[in-house]
């Protein structure tokens, strides 16, 4: 006999005929014949049981009445070479029995079956099971499935069996698959209603309160399972004092604006989190050296060069909600390039740059209010400049560094308010062409050029400016020097990507605040040779935001699921 399967079949034949059997597994009134040696070889539990003082060597029976007979019988058949026949109903019993008997291969087979068949119809059931039996692999997989399908599950009959501890974990998770934070209170209310359990402050703390619409906050106030709890009403009365919340991963789209790898058009790319890739969603004719500003989910591109050798005064825009281009926007007062763009609650600002007629530097700051027919001059910088960093923070326009007369960099930092210009602490080094972002109450800049004379040295510097203390802090440098990179912030993390050169254009980096270091980010790799001008997190908008509050607003909100 030279085949192990034939050997196993022969031994199973001995068991079926009772030959050489030396142990009986007793479960209530049922008995299962077996061989100690075979059971010990497959099960750590039986190996310890039969090789210790737990059972006398002459003892012929082992009582396992606390276990499920069918599961034990199936597992002993499995030990003797008969494949497991698994179903969604049986696999939990067999897995917990295999775990008790410590049959490793059966455990793996059951886990693989569950992972393969995990879906929205069974994820809650498997999550509750895995939590009970402390199976972290199944618990993690089923929990992630719950997060992905949460809006489908709120009407599932098993939804009410989730514990408050589980709901706190679900509602707190950044990966909760909702495209608008208003759906989080809906999830909470549906669970409260299905369990008839009163709300707690711990549950309310899981909501990103600062991101909720007034209509949903009113709905929380008025719901009987919330309003009847004094502590909950007290919490809601003090939400104005809560810190600003970060959006969940799926409530925003990461949109990049740049020049396509063929370098013949502007490309709008969207980051696909499932595939960890950037996908082009739209494009138009070539343009470069333009300013970018984002207002109400519309990306505005101002000035720059098109396919002619002349600078442009045109302003075009891309609406991320309708996935369409907008061309009927008033032109700038005159053609310009290498300018900066920022927005406040009402206006879009175009700052500085280079004029088309004589390539002279510009000091003008022009602004436009959407729906108005023209741009108007708002102010003038103290010194004409281009390729500077610009930022809007606490209602002030900050202008950082840039290229001034003579083609040299400057180290100035100044802010503009209704009262005029104010000088601040200078940069540690003269810089231009850097990326700029406001993050956690500070201004961050990265990359660009650094030189006190001719602009020619590519930088990997990263600096942060604290407006409260009027001070600059040098952070860990980028791994790769970058010119005009895109700098963006998502979920309290900083990222930088792209470069306006032919080298390493498809790399991005992420900043670890605790370790003060930048690491190459494999999750946001750009298309090859794609020049990223700007990257913006775009918050999803829903028609419900325009709906007036009513007593059944949450039901109205539920009708938008899937839209």
Curated annotation (Swiss-Prot):
Its main location: host cell. One of its GO terms (biological process) is symbiont-mediated perturbation of host ubiquitin-like protein modification. SMART domains: BACK, BTB, Kelch. InterPro entries: BACK, BTB/POZ_dom, Kelch-typ_b-propeller, Kelch_1, SKP1/BTB/POZ_sf, Vaccinia_A55R. SUPFAM superfamilies: Kelch motif, POZ domain. Keywords: Host cytoplasm, Host-virus interaction, Kelch repeat, Modulation of host E3 ubiquitin ligases by virus, Modulation of host ubiquitin pathway by virus, Repeat, Ubl conjugation pathway. Residues 123-219 form the BACK domain. It comes from the Viruses. Kelch repeats lie at residues 252-297, 298-346, 347-395, 397-441, 442-492, 494-540. It is found in: Host cytoplasm. GO terms for cellular component: host cell cytoplasm. Residues 21-88 form the BTB domain. Signal peptide: none annotated. Probable substrate-specific adapter of CUL3-containing E3 ubiquitin-protein ligases which mediate the ubiquitination and subsequent proteasomal degradation of host target proteins. Interacts (via BTB domain) with host CUL3. The BTB domain is responsible for the interaction with CUL3 while the Kelch repeat domains supposely serve to recruit the cellular substrates. This is Kelch repeat and BTB domain-containing protein 1. It comes from Ectromelia virus (strain Moscow).
